Amino acid sequence: MLARYFSLSLLATAVSAASISDLVGTWSTKSRKVVTGPDFYDPINDKFLEPNLTGISYSFTEDGHYEEAYYRAVANPVNPSCPKGIMQWQHGKFVLNSDGSLELTPIASDGRQLVSDPCSSSLATYTRYNQTETFNVSKDPYHGIQRLDLKRFDDSPMHPMYLVYQPPQMLPTTTLNPVSETGKSKRHVARDTDRLPGVRNLITKEELTNPDRWLWVGVFATALGGITLFYS
């Protein structure tokens, strides 16, 4: 299991998240097209539902549960017209420490990742995904809008997230994909997955050349090294 470490940069108007109640709700990046819950991941059929645009979303409950949803496009420097698409989903429990840091521990068997490389294969790669995360957290109430600003361990900023739902929009917080003693899923699902047909249309020329659009490339490159393949 890998761990990612992030810190938060506070703007002049930012305030620390002093309690869990400050985090409760569903947060999403500017597009607001990626939101946790049943519109992103279908646990019954064990499949992702592709949003119209890329983005990130986190949800937190008062009793210490969280859920996260990522849909990112990764630039291809060799062939800019063939970006990769990555969808990730996790949920589990979180702890807000006295120093303001936030520790997120996922349910190991439930996390999912889908990687689509449309120029290399007509099928996407579907795997289990399990990665513990640690953040320092505060909220920026700029102009009265509740906003969550995160920075990575190297002080590079992540995309800000805005409060979109309160109470949060989430799937059940219990284990959704239990495994047997052999480590195999108790639920039989198809392993051939649909590719992400819209990924080429999600990135404009400006986005491909703007480095601020690709803050997560290094994070995903690191995360891919810690993934366990999802066997039937």
From Swiss-Prot:
The keyword Ion transport does not apply. The chain crosses the membrane at residues 214-231. Pfam families: Rot1 (PF10681). Residues 1-17 form the signal peptide. Its main location: endoplasmic reticulum. GO terms for biological process: 'de novo' protein folding. It is a single-pass type I membrane protein. Keywords: Endoplasmic reticulum, Glycoprotein, Membrane, Signal, Transmembrane, Transmembrane helix. Glycans are attached at residues 52, 130, 136. One of its GO terms (molecular function) is unfolded protein binding. It is found in: Endoplasmic reticulum membrane. One of its GO terms (cellular component) is endoplasmic reticulum membrane. Residues 232 are cytoplasmic. Residues 18-213 are lumenal. Required for normal levels of the cell wall 1,6-beta-glucan. Involved in a protein folding machinery chaperoning proteins acting in various physiological processes including cell wall synthesis and lysis of autophagic bodies. Belongs to the ROT1 family. This is Protein rot1. It comes from Aspergillus oryzae (strain ATCC 42149 / RIB 40) (Yellow koji mold).
